[in-house]
Amino acid sequence: MMKRVFSISWYLIIVLLIGSCDQIFNSKDNDDTKEIFDEGRINPTLEKLDGYAPVQPFWSGFDAPEDVHIGFDEFVYVTDANGLHLLDRGDLSPRITISLDGATAVTQDRLLNVYVSARIDTIIESIDPTITWNLPAIFKIKNMNGAGPLTYVDTLIFPFDDASLSTSAAQNARLNRNSSFNYERVKITGLSILGDNTLYVTRKGPFNEITQVAAPDNTVLEFSRIRENGVLTSKMINVRQIRTLNPAIPSLRSGIGLSAISSFVASPQRDSFTDDRSFLIAQADQNVDIPFRVLWVNAVETVDGLVFQQNSSLLAQDTTQADGFLYEPNKFIKPVDIAYTADDDSYIFVIDQELNKLFQFQTNGQEGVPPPAGAEDQTRQILVSFGEFGAGPKQFNQPSGVAYFDRVVYVADKGNNRISRFKLTSDFE
């Protein structure tokens, strides 16, 4: 459907021709002003001085959106019940849609390849040629943004692309519909990219033994590009399963019912990125009491290689500086997505689906933003986290994804079938 696009400069030309002081500057109740607000300006009646204000219009027309991501190409990628959608950041051009069954998480690497987790139907002749299996998969897609012919350059299908299940016997053992460990019950829940285009994947499922050769289902997997004859190809291979995350016992280094992952690399594109392989994860399992559901896991180079350690420093909480903290026990109920801003602010956003709330933290674990100039208390962070159940401009209904770009926060508001957008009032010029 074509959209009518009005530029602010066009409105200013019109009102200048009309004359009159009120018409030149516009009032809050003026129809022109309201329409300008609808095209992306802050509505001043909706927000106090400090906090996140809705950036309208919100984007509708989705069917239970699961995730939202702003790529290095600066396009917006959204997954929902119909598959994967591409939008420009104003949602002004026709959307591009790829139909995918069960599309959930989406990310993009620095080479502009898009990765999306979904489901795939496949027949495994060695088991039974009459059975169609519905398995978790990750599709690697090139040129969805129109830079060339759209191409599926790789498809990772599980359990076959889990290096810890390296034999056909081990793989086929997980494909049994009479077993509680049947791999059709496994889900890929999160995707994130590192500076060298390595892919992090979060997975959850029923098999969580830690003494077996096979990695537990609740884990983080790492995929890198395959090198052939010294040349990197577009194909991916599983190079690591991060087994230091306990799949069943809560701690500062656990991975129970993993729902999301975020590295510390994010758009916009630049010449170089951090080589830090640390990450943030969310644990959404509702059958386990998990005091710390969002964790920062440090990747540390040692003489024995790369090890993954808990970030105990976030337990230090100065209540004279902030009222909330990332490592506050029982802070979250069902965190389902995380976003890191990778700009000068270095904010961390967490979406809690059960609380219908967007949380915002700094990298020191403190909740809130620094006080603006002129604030009476310059030592205490200002809480800007918000949300409750509903369909209003600062309400959510089962929010499931969060992204950030150029000081705008994007939320996949699943139950309201929309992408909501927000911006700090202090960031409006």
PLM ranges: what are they?
Residues 68, 106, 191, 258-264, ...:
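Hydrophobic core register within WD40 beta-propeller blades
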